[in-house]
Swiss-Prot record:
It is found in: Cytoplasm. Its cofactor is FAD. This is tRNA uridine 5-carboxymethylaminomethyl modification enzyme MnmG. Its main location: cytoplasm. It comes from Ectopseudomonas mendocina (strain ymp).
């Protein structure tokens, strides 16, 4: 049976990638269907109850700058907020929020149900309708056919999902949910490279059975940070603490004695796990010299006693899990509510995708999230927003969009994936970005909101707030530039006394703010400056203090822009370019980079090869011009 209405975009999956994809397409005005196997799990946090962190919060802020839901839901569901790396430079500062699972999911559901142009339908997708290498729709579990020319797949860990606890395993998409087997088989029939990855989760603990008095309390920051540029503190729920404890020699003995019962170390699990979020058995094996590892005890919500012991993800048998947990200080009498487990799932080589996240072999088919080999809610949400945006642009007959590496962490993420691929779950870090002083979390809106407005992703409320902020920054910079302080005046003496730096001559406030020892808040207090919005003050201070470094990065970006903007034809025959080695010809033909800049980032492609490519492109262009003039 065919569904009576046709859609422009269909999104399969209602996790972090799927919700952002569906919302993005709908915000852009196209008729969008969100297909989920269970409406009750829309926006569910399947793993740890937290959003943000180093590199990750940059993605969340970028999603927010483009009108996405993740930051707003975090502000409404966050029960502890902290700024990480607060004593370091602004490039690596990151916001992290502990979230109440129920409140977060409810916030996402509310946003979805109130989004115009978005329809939600509960059914598992079993098949894709493909005609002449173009996607045409989706077939559900009950045989219902939905038609659309753009389909976004955000399947998470559900494709061929296999859950492991000890040497026992069973099919599942996550604990309590069935896997997507029919769709996994269908996708394996397509000419796409497929692999297996693995992730895991720790046992959940009943907080009433834990002794917090022997643990270290970890409170949130005051005043509480906000994740969204439009966030308001009055929307944040009650704030509570996390706690820290440690594994010990006894814990490590228990694990070492039972590695033969681990599916990871007995060869049962084929998939590669996340390097930066290893299981506790992996930590003990890889870091055998360490006597202990931190365990962060994270509350799962305000209305539950369940705790998430971050740091002891495991797939060991339940009896071993119980021994591990009870060997840890403060958890000697702990009751496990849910056992930890590992899950294996299918992913597809992201080098088979375009920058738009559309597959190269099936027109209109987009992939986002863990299906592309990434790990993390934030990485999934960022890909989802981009895929949904490009699916909508395709439906509108417009050119696809993806930010460059120098414009957004989303650009870094996508470029890394489609250029380098990944053999293990990919996690974002600030260290992956060459231009991280420009790509700060605090200026994501200044980098992206204008483009989001142009694309149709940003609504009137967000645009008005953004314009007010941007204008406020200009006004404040002008005020500081035109306000002068002279030595020997009360203000000049106060500045000298406060910062221990006598004024040698007359300075404007912007010059003074550029000094590392002078901060904006103190300067505003001494000079009795008018009150300014915190976001405006932050931008003015960072731009002023880091102006020289920022200018140098901008100059470097300008120098490299030519190669980034030089497009490589999709039909370019690399084997016909003389001077390229067979190895480089193979790598270029296998990856089929979209630009000269991307080609240069493929491992093994040398600067000399890039020069040969550039010469070939110039000759090709000249030849085409001659043909046209003939």
């Amino acid at each position: 049976m065919d569904f009576p209405s046709r859609f422009d975009v269909i999104v399969i999956g209602g996790g972090h990638a799927g919700t952002e994809a569906a919302l993005a397409a709908a915000r852009m005005g196209v008729k969008t269907l969100l297909l989920t196997h269970n409406v009750e799990t829309l926006g569910q946090m399947s793993c740890n109850p937290a959003i943000g962190g180093i590199g990750k919060s940059h993605l969340v802020k970028e999603i927010d700058a483009l009108g996405g839901a993740m930051a707003t839901a975090t502000d409404k569901g966050g029960i502890q907020f902290r700024i990480l790396n607060s004593r370091k430079g602004p490039a690596v500062r990151a916001t992290r929020a502990q979230a109440d699972r129920v409140l977060y999911k409810a916030a996402v559901r509310e946003i979805l149900e109130n989004q115009a142009n978005l329809w939600i339908f509960q059914q598992a997708a079993d098949d894709l309708i493909v005609e002449n290498a173009q996607v045409k729709g989706v077939v559900t579990q009950m045989g219902l056919r939905f038609h659309a020319d753009s389909v976004v797949l955000t399947t998470g860990t559900f494709l061929g999902g296999l859950i492991h606890i000890g040497l026992q395993n069973y099919s599942g998409g996550r604990a309590g949910d069935p896997p997507s087997m029919a769709l996994a088989h269908r996708l394996r029939e397509l000419p796409l490279r497929v692999g297996r990855l693995k992730t895991g989760t720790p046992p959940r603990i009943d907080g009433r059975s834990v002794d917090f008095s022997v643990m270290t309390e970890q409170p949130g920051d005051t005043p509480t940070p906000l994740m969204s540029f439009l966030g308001k503190r009055e929307h944040q729920p009650k704030q509570i603490s996390c706690w820290i404890t440690h594994t010990n020699a006894r814990t490590h003995e228990i694990i070492a004695a039972n590695l033969d019962r681990s599916p990871m170390y007995s060869g049962v699990i084929e998939g590669v796990g996340p390097r930066y979020c290893p299981s506790i058995e992996d930590k003990i094996h890889r870091f055998a010299d360490k006597d202990s590892h931190q365990v962060f005890i994270e509350p799962e919500g305000l209305t539950t006693h369940e705790l998430y012991p971050n740091g002891i993800s495991t797939s060991l048998p339940f009896d071993v899990q119980l021994q591990i947990v009870r060997s840890i200080r403060g958890m000697e009498n702990a009751h496990i509510v849910r056992p930890g487990y590992a899950i294996e799932y299918d992913y597809f080589d992201p080098r088979d995708l375009k920058y738009s996240l559309e597959t190269k072999v099936i027109g209109g088919l987009f992939f986002a999230g863990q299906i592309n080999g990434t790990t993390g809610y934030e990485e999934a949400g960022a890909q989802g927003l981009l895929a949904g945006c490009n699916a909508a642009l395709r439906a509108q007959g417009k050119e696809a969009w993806c930010p460059r590496r120098d414009e957004a962490y989303i650009g870094v993420l996508v470029d890394d994936l489609i250029t380098l691929g990944t053999q293990e779950p990919y996690r974002m870090f600030t260290s992956r970005a060459e231009y991280r002083l420009i790509l700060r979390e605090d200026n994501a809106d200044l980098r992206l909101t204008e483009k989001g407005r142009e694309l149709g992703l940003v609504d009137d409320e967000r645009w008005a707030a953004f314009e007010a902020k941007r204008e406020g920054i200009v006004r404040e910079e002008q005020r500081l530039k035109s306000t002068w302080v002279r030595p020997g005046t009360p203000q000049g003496d106060a500045i000298a006394a406060r910062f221990g730096t006598p004024l040698a001559h007359e300075y404007n406030l912007l010059n003074l703010l550029a000094r590392p020892e002078i901060d904006y808040a103190a300067l505003a207090e001494i000079t009795e400056s008018p009150a300014v919005d915190n976001q405006v003050a932050e931008q003015v201070e960072i731009k002023t203090k880091y102006a020289g470094y920022i200018d140098r990065q901008q100059d470097e970006i300008a120098r490299l822009r030519a190669s980034e903007d030089t497009k490589l034809p999709e039909d370019l025959d690399y084997s016909a370019i003389s001077g390229l080695s067979k190895e480089i010809q193979f790598k270029l033909g296998n990856t089929r980079p979209a630009t000269l800049g991307q080609a240069g980032r493929i491992p093994g492609v040398t600067p000399a090869a890039i020069s040969l490519l550039l010469i070939h492109l110039k000759k090709r262009s000249a030849g085409q011009k001659l043909e046209q003039s003939a």
